[in-house]
A protein has these predicted regions:
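ATP/Mg2+-dependent ligation/transfer catalytic cores
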Residues: 2-210
Length: 210
């Protein structure tokens, strides 16, 4: 179990991957408004599709892939839950999305980074570049209620942050006596992971007779 934390080593390990300066790889959250996003996409005709991705209660992701022209034409509808739907057969929402009430709507999330996934085996004839799909993390709505894992996590974090602020407001925290708790504006939760490379390392050496 080899954990690589050194950036220089990591770059050598994944040195086979080279970024193409002609391709767009992500759209940072909050950096572009509607017109900025549409202008950026217009400059990259190799991005042919958009994929809205939602996570159900079992942790499975479900996505709907749509031509980029529809996304650009009906941009606002994608953030209002009016553009893309799926049925309950593709998601796990026990006793929520039922057979006779299965419609689930996607709502694109504008508060997170969007990424572009390229298919190197499918080259765009007009540009000579691989065909790209803009992947947008999304929420899932059923009967006007957010029901997906991401929305539950978001509400949980918002609730815990508010309760923590109430709990420590005006109080002295041991080890942080000089910290002005009353001035805390927000509590932000982050998650982290580590990139691991698994290698086979025999624990014993054997002598084999031929």
């Amino acid at each position: 179990n080899l954990v690589v934390k050194d950036t220089a080593v990591l770059k050598k390990l994944i040195g086979g991957f080279k970024m193409n300066k002609d391709l767009l790889y992500w759209i940072p959250a909050g950096q572009y408004g509607k017109e900025g996003v549409l202008s950026l996409l217009a400059q990259h005709p190799e991005i042919r599709f958009v994929s809205l991705i939602g996570i159900d209660l079992a942790g499975n992701d479900t996505d709907e892939k749509i031509p980029i022209e529809i996304f650009m034409k009906d941009y606002d509808d994608f953030f209002a839950g009016k553009a893309v739907q799926t049925d309950g057969s593709s998601v796990v929402f026990m006793n929520i999305a039922t057979l006779n009430d299965a419609r689930v709507d996607f709502v694109a999330d504008s508060t997170v980074n969007w990424y572009v996934d390229y298919n190197d085996e499918n080259v765009d004839d007009a540009t000579g570049l691989p065909v790209g799909t803009l992947r947008i993390p999304s929420f899932l709505i059923h009967n006007d209620k957010f029901i997906d894992s991401r929305s539950i996590l978001k509400r949980s974090c918002d609730y815990v942050a508010e309760e923590l602020k109430k709990l420590i407001a005006g109080k002295t925290i041991k080890g942080m006596e000089n910290f002005p708790t009353g001035e805390i504006q927000d509590i932000v939760f982050t998650t982290g992971t580590e990139l691991e490379f698994w290698v086979k390392t025999p624990s014993e050496k054997e002598t084999v007779q031929h």
